[in-house]
Amino acid sequence: GISESVKAFCGRDISKEPIPVIPTVHYCMGGIPTNFKAEVLKPNDSNTEEVCEGLMAIGEAACASVHGANRLGTNALAELVVFGRGAAIQAGQVIDSNESLRMPSQSQTNLIIERLESIKNNKGDVSVGELREKMQKTVQKRFGVYRESETLKLGNDELASMSQDLKHIKVKDQSDIFNTDLVEALELHNLMQVAGSVGVSAEQRTESRGAHAREDFPERDDENWLKHTLF
């Protein structure tokens, strides 16, 4: 039951002590920019709606701008249904059933393989698990619910230091199949990028909007910040 779980994971006796409760991340409001058809956009100075042909994204990976700055409860499921269906319909319209599958170029394949090999064979001494935990604690402490300039800057400085440590991580498992160590290392690279985008964006946005609450800038500023942050 609950008492056994709390005892096992927190080392607490709930008949004598309260259960510790802290906020945690359960949704990412942001991601790859998309249109309402789930097509990925590559905005530029001349066309903010330019489509990246053949590439789609839905769910938390995507940012179709339907939630604003604070998603309401249960809307994530509705988002998946709506945009998942929209993506399928659009894919059916743009795919030529008579066209054969185009294979990626060898140069593109080589780049991916080289990246995997460089991470797997890196001669570092930094533990992936320890660096990930360090990053998680920094994000929890510096980029939490209530934010202000000093803690955001500290968090970004700490992440910048960790990004240097990322160059020295060690993957113990050297196998080519079912290599969870390598998967965790790749995940850490992605997590560091996401954490960096959150921290830099939060520090730059000198206002409060939706789930972004700045104690030093408590008011919404539509004149300067009614826009997305592109990272």
Whereabouts are the PLM-identified features?
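An anion/pyrophosphate-binding glycine-rich loop and adjacent beta-alpha core
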Residues: 1-25, 90-96, 132, 137
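Long, contiguous hydrophobic alpha-helical segments, chiefly transmembrane helices and signal peptides
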Residues: 2, 19-21, 32-34, 61, ...
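FAD/FMN-dependent oxidoreductases across multiple families
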Residues: 8-53
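Glycine- and aromatic-enriched mobile tails/lids
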Residues: 27, 39-57, 61-231
